[in-house]
Structure formats: structure tokens, C-alpha cells
């Protein structure tokens, strides 16, 4: 039984500037009593205000999922298809450029570019050539756009296909126009969970190596946690510890890039493969549990990773807005389209307008502002004029 005095002592220590450790974080993550969760929420909200202030950011961006053809079979994924399967798609450059032009006309500053692991995606017999050509075509057409592109899993796939090092792949993509990497494919950085959740995916050590290498070559990354499936509170805490260690290493090593944000990705199982859905026994995320994890993430990471974002796609805009009182200071992006989570049965929608995001932030009593991918404020007049 977790008592109020224990929780209060942990929270007081964090608010006094002492780093939260995995054991204490596990205690907080096990809190089920509403009053205990309210204590944790209050501390996370206080720390958020102290660390990043009371303004809330958003980014005007567009998702570009260029293919769902994938060689892997992750047990939580309803997005992937075999090449000859109904619903499979592989968008050519002309369609991506058309989508990009529409996004730029709507004021976008970022494209988020990710896809399945398609062994046929090659140019001149090489995977890297395909990804470089894809990146360069978008960057040449829209030089002002930041390309937030290719997860560590995609980097590992390219390196394996072509017999290259991670550094070689990352350097080539950076030269072609990639500006940062999404820190997806992390799921939970515990290989006992990964063996059930995504047995074909890269392991935890490889994910961390690719993130570190990206920082070393000057590519910022995000960080994520897929929560609410098979993982335990202890595994959640250890995941946060590994993210913190990555950022601490980047700071200590004075690498030219760092982790820019933490995003919680609650599991959506409604249309996910049946075996995992049956084990989890829940189709939609539990908002209360997701809010608790976000609060503990703020307490754990806030001094090192200051920006925290909920997923309105997974939680709905109302749920994501609640997260602004649980340690989050960003409401994410407009997206304009979304396939991966919506195909799993998420009910949060696939796009938000600037007006919707700003209204949600204002309703939470905060001041909205537009940012770029690296959390720099955007001069709105300049964006719309350009």
C-alpha cells in the first residue's frame, strides 16, 4: 500500500531539485488512489511552470507516411501491409510533392516523414539511394521546410540492407536535407517486453546507439514511450531512466544535437492484431493512467528534456488538453493527415487546425504560441508572408 506521506516525501525531494530515481518513480507510477494522483499532478504542474513557464506551443506540420508496406509484423500495428495485400500503398514523389505544397500553403514549417520497412524501396539496388532521393526531392521543392524524418528503426533497416554503418546512413540523410529524427520505435526500452510486442524490431541497445549517433552527427531527436499495454510501472520508470541517461550523455559530451522533447504514446488496440489486444483487454487508452505517466515523466525528465507533449491523436484533443495540467507544455502538431494510429482505431482524429489548437490551449488558461520543430518561436507574420 502506497501512503500519502511516502508520495509527499518523494515529491518534495524532486521539487527541491533532487533527481527522481527509478525506484521512487515506480512508487509514483503505482499510485491508484485519486488523492495520491492529485498530489503527483500538482507537483508536475508546479515543476512544468518552473521549468518552461505557462505558455503552450504547437507546430504547423504535415505527416507524410509514404508507404505502409513493411517486412515486420509488430503485434500492436494495424498500419502495416504486405505488398500484395488490400490496403497497401506506396506513394510516389509527385503525390508527396502535391501534399507538401498544400501543407506549405497552409503555413506548415515541418514535414514528418516516416514509412514502413519496404525491401523494394531501392534506387540503383540501394535502400539509402531511395531515402536520399526522397529526402532531397522534398528539400529541393521546399527548402524552408524542416524535415523531421525516419525513425531509428528505418535507419537500422537502411544500414542492414546496404551494409553501412549507422553514422554513414545518418550523414547521408543529413546531407540530403533531414533536419531531425523522430524518436519512435522506442516503444518500451526493455527487451523482455519487446520480444512480445515487436520481436522483429531493433533491440533497446541498438535504438539508443542510433539516437546517440544522430546527436553526434548533429541531428536532434525526439523521445517517446509507448504505454498502457504489457509494461509494468518499473519498466516505465527504467525507460525514463534510459532516456535521461541519453540526454545526460549528450550534454556531458557537448554533442551538437540533443533530445528536443518527450512524447507519451498510449497504446490504441481497437484494430490492432488480436493476440495483443486480447492480452491488454482494452481498446482505447486509459486517460487517467496516461496522465499519471506524463506527470511522472515531467518529474523524471524535466531538468534534462524540458518539452513534453501528449498525443491528441491517441487521447483526443480534450484528453491532450488535460495533459497540460499534468506536466505537458506542448500540444503537438496540426498533422493534416494521420494513418498509423487512426488505422489502429484511435478516436482522436487525424488533423487539427491552428484555431482548434489555440482554442484548446486558451481554454486551459494558457497562452498559445507557434513553434518550429526545435521549439523556437515562429514569427507568424513571416510564415504567412512566405
Swiss-Prot record:
Give the originating organism: Synechococcus elongatus (strain ATCC 33912 / PCC 7942 / FACHB-805)
Q: Which reaction does it catalyse?
A: 5-amino-6-(D-ribitylamino)uracil + L-tyrosine + S-adenosyl-L-methionine = 5-amino-5-(4-hydroxybenzyl)-6-(D-ribitylimino)-5,6-dihydrouracil + 2-iminoacetate + 5'-deoxyadenosine + L-methionine + H(+)
Q: Which cofactor does it need?
A: [4Fe-4S] cluster
Question: What does the cofactor field's note say?
Answer: Binds 1 [4Fe-4S] cluster. The cluster is coordinated with 3 cysteines and an exchangeable S-adenosyl-L-methionine.
Recorded GO terms, molecular function? 4 iron, 4 sulfur cluster binding; 5-amino-6-(D-ribitylamino)uracil--L-tyrosine 4-hydroxyphenyl transferase activity; 7,8-didemethyl-8-hydroxy-5-deazariboflavin synthase activity; iron ion binding
Q: Which Gene3D superfamilies match?
A: Aldolase class I
* Name of the featured protein: 5-amino-6-(D-ribitylamino)uracil--L-tyrosine 4-hydroxyphenyl transferase
Give the EC number(s) under which this enzyme is classified.
Answer: 2.5.1.147
Amino acid at each position: 500500500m502506497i501512503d500519502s506521506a511516502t508520495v509527499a516525501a518523494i515529491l518534495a525531494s524532486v521539487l527541491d531539485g533532487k533527481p527522481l530515481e527509478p525506484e521512487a518513480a515506480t512508487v509514483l507510477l503505482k499510485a491508484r488512489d485519486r488523492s495520491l494522483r492529485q498530489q503527483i499532478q500538482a507537483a508536475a504542474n508546479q515543476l512544468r511552470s518552473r521549468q518552461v513557464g505557462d505558455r503552450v506551443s504547437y507546430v504547423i506540420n504535415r505527416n507524410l507516411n509514404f508507404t505502409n508496406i513493411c517486412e515486420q509484423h509488430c503485434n500492436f500495428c494495424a498500419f502495416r501491409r504486405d505488398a500484395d495485400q488490400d490496403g497497401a500503398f506506396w506513394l510516389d514523389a509527385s503525390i508527396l510533392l502535391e501534399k507538401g505544397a498544400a501543407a506549405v500553403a497552409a503555413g506548415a514549417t515541418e514535414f514528418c516523414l516516416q514509412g514502413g520497412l519496404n525491401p523494394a524501396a531501392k534506387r540503383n539496388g540501394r535502400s539509402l539511394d531511395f531515402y536520399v532521393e526522397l529526402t532531397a526531392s522534398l528539400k529541393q521543392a521546399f527548402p524552408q521546410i524542416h524535415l523531421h524524418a525516419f525513425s531509428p528503426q528505418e535507419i537500422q533497416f537502411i544500414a542492414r540492407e546496404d551494409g553501412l554503418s549507422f553514422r554513414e546512413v545518418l550523414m547521408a540523410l543529413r546531407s540530403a536535407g533531414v533536419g531531425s529524427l523522430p524518436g519512435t520505435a522506442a516503444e518500451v526500452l526493455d527487451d523482455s517486453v519487446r520480444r512480445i510486442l515487436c520481436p522483429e524490431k531493433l533491440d533497446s541497445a541498438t535504438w539508443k546507439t542510433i539516437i546517440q549517433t544522430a546527436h553526434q552527427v548533429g541531428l536532434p531527436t525526439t523521445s517517446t514511450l509507448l504505454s498502457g499495454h504489457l509494461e509494468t510501472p518499473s519498466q516505465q520508470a527504467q525507460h525514463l531512466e534510459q532516456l535521461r541517461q541519453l540526454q545526460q550523455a549528450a550534454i556531458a559530451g557537448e554533442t551538437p544535437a540533443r533530445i528536443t522533447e518527450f512524447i507519451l504514446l498510449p497504446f490504441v488496440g481497437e484494430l490492432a492484431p488480436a493476440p495483443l489486444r486480447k492480452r491488454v483487454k482494452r481498446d482505447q487508452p486509459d486517460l487517467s493512467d496516461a496522465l499519471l505517466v506524463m506527470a511522472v515523466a515531467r518529474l523524471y525528465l524535466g531538468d534534462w528534456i524540458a518539452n513534453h507533449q501528449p498525443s491528441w491523436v491517441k487521447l483526443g484533443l480534450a484528453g491532450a488538453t488535460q495533459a497540460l495540467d499534468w506536466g505537458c507544455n506542448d500540444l503537438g502538431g496540426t498533422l493534416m493527415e494521420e494513418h498509423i494510429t487512426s488505422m489502429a482505431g484511435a478516436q482522436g482524429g487525424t488533423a487539427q487546425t491552428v484555431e482548434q489548437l489555440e482554442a484548446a490551449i486558451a481554454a486551459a488558461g494558457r497562452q498559445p504560441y507557434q513553434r518550429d520543430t526545435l521549439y523556437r518561436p515562429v514569427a507568424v507574420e513571416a510564415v504567412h508572408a512566405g
